[in-house]
Amino acid sequence: LDIAKAFAANVINGGSGNLIICGSVGTGKTLLASAICEAVIAKKTCRMIRVIDLVRKIKETWSRGSDISEQQIIDQFASVDLLVLDEVGIQFGTDTEKLFLFDVIDLRYQRNLPTVLISNLAVEDIANAVGSRVVDRLRENGGKYIAMKWDSKRK
């Protein structure tokens, strides 16, 4: 909890850095990330989205009648003060999906904007889902990791 509070305070104060939250189903990962967003959103912009929904939004731009480009969607998510990507690892893990995530996270990395990744996967398995370049960027400059190692609260 202290790591999450410090992370939120850092974002509010204009700091960078990233956070990876991992744990089994029902351990409160999304709730914790939502609390971080609630703390941040009073002073900064924050966007929370499941990775699969982000991928869908980008793919929707491929339709003939789309009024928005792939790059515009990527820029929307790359420019908010804090981006929370939930359910990392439930997507198919295709090269295209990994490229989309890399594009968003790399732009955020270049802009020194913080990102939170939430996953049921162990931290060492996240690279398989999103690519090692993404994980490398998230860990740089003191990226934090929270392991929620307790039983589901939904039972």
Label each PLM-derived region with a short phrase.
Residues 2, 41-79:
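Short glycine-rich substrate-engagement loop in P-loop NTPases that contacts/grips substrate
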Residues 16-20, 45-46, 82, 114-116:
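Residue-level preference for the first positions of well-ordered beta-strands
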